[in-house]
């Protein structure tokens, strides 16, 4: 071996050693087989699909579907003895729910459906018009699949950390509310109950992250949704709604509106 060749081999040795050491690290860094690099919550959706395939089908349950505001809600405890199915997953956008729609739905048709999604869409840069379009697409699909179920869409909520997005959220709420009646969907205003007397989000109702609600905030949502579910006992599942208006349910009353603001 020439002196030049020996010198080159000596110079390359540290590089080869580093590369060899990096191989095990690279192997451990590989994503799980069911992980989608563009969708970090694939495991949650996979768990829903397994539950659908193996678990008992709950008849006449209330399906809650959407993002982390649904996932973090103690739905089973909050609405007992009503049978419930929680299909919320963290960080979900409306396109995510539409993409995984078939894997999220329970095997038995629900008696009622409660939807909350769209907030993360806006946080990701989507326009209010696009969010409302996707949300209406989801509501239309749910209505087509469950023609006799009652469906409620929860208005996008204000929060301390996303307060700058509130004007866009209110715009989404207005657009969806004006079109909900034709789909026989009730719009429940869950935002007003989270505001303090000064009109700003009440920080005492949120976790330290300023985004997700604490138990006190969820109790306010539970009261509203419980009131809506109790209406189900007095009306048939396919009760008629004026297609020119929508039901906006607030903490105080139900308002019929055609162009109303959720406030």
Language model features with spans:
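Extracellular/periplasmic catalytic domains that process cell-envelope and extracellular macromolecules
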Residues: 55-58, 78-79, 106-108, 145, ...
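Acidic/histidine-rich helix-loop elements
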Residues: 36-39, 82-95, 123, 210
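Charged helix-capping and loop-helix junction motifs
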Residues: 128-137, 168-173
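A short helix->loop->beta-strand "cap" motif at the edges of active sites that frequently abuts
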Residues: 146-150
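N-terminal secretory targeting modules
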Residues: 1-64, 75-78, 230-263
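Oxyanion-hole/transition-state-stabilizing segment in secreted/luminal serine hydrolases
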Residues: 70-83, 94-132, 152, 156-160
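Catalytic His-Asp segment of secreted/periplasmic serine-dependent ester chemistry enzymes
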Residues: 160-250, 256-263
